[in-house]
Structures are given as structure tokens and as C-alpha cells.
């Protein structure tokens, strides 16, 4: 079990930032690092999104709560019921590690597939039709006397 509510993902950003600090910046091509940096920024934002959405759904400012969790050490996270930063294990807000790992692996796999595919095909959304008008008021002769 790992801390739930997206807090584990937010705390994982610290490892990504450590990688950014220590990674070679050129690999022989300056453009390569620029492309990698864009990918890293996308992953960083994606890892924040579950917590941001949970906070928003609970009526809080998501970005503020993400920063609050970032400033704490694991296993602290955002408790949407109380609006406080708590020890997620003590609060009982946990999730299975395997589920989170599988979600991240599947997302990475799909991302890699999109990057290596030359063409993507998607359905064009059909315009939504207005609902039919409601029938007129009561039927003649059936009203109350």
C-alpha cells in the first residue's frame, strides 16, 4: 500500500527533479535535451493532476494543495474531507501500489506508441442534437374541477 489521493505521485516528482539536476544536458545534441525537457515537464504536470483534481472537486484550489503536499515529506498528503495535510497512512487514505504502477506503465506505453506512430485515427465528434420539445400542458377535458 502507498499513500493515496495522488500524494505518492506528487512526491515522485522529487525524483524526477533530481534526475533533471544530474542528467547530462546534451547527449551530443542540444535539441535532444530540449525535447527531453519538454517530456519531463509533461510528466511532472501529469503527476500533479490527480491531486489537483481531487482538491478542486472538494472545493479547494488544486495548485495550492499540490504545493502544500510538495512542501511536506511522504507519506503526507491532502485529505479532501478535512482540507488538511495529513499523514495518509494514519488517516487511512491509501491505495494499492500495483494499481498505481500499472496506471503509470500503461500511460508510458501509450505515450511511446503515440510518439512512434506516424498516423493517429480518431472519430470526429458528431454535433449534439437538441432534445425534443416537451409536449404541451394537460389534455383537454381531463383537468380537475
Language model features: what each stretch is:
Residues 1-145:
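Extended, low-charge hydrophobic alpha-helical regions
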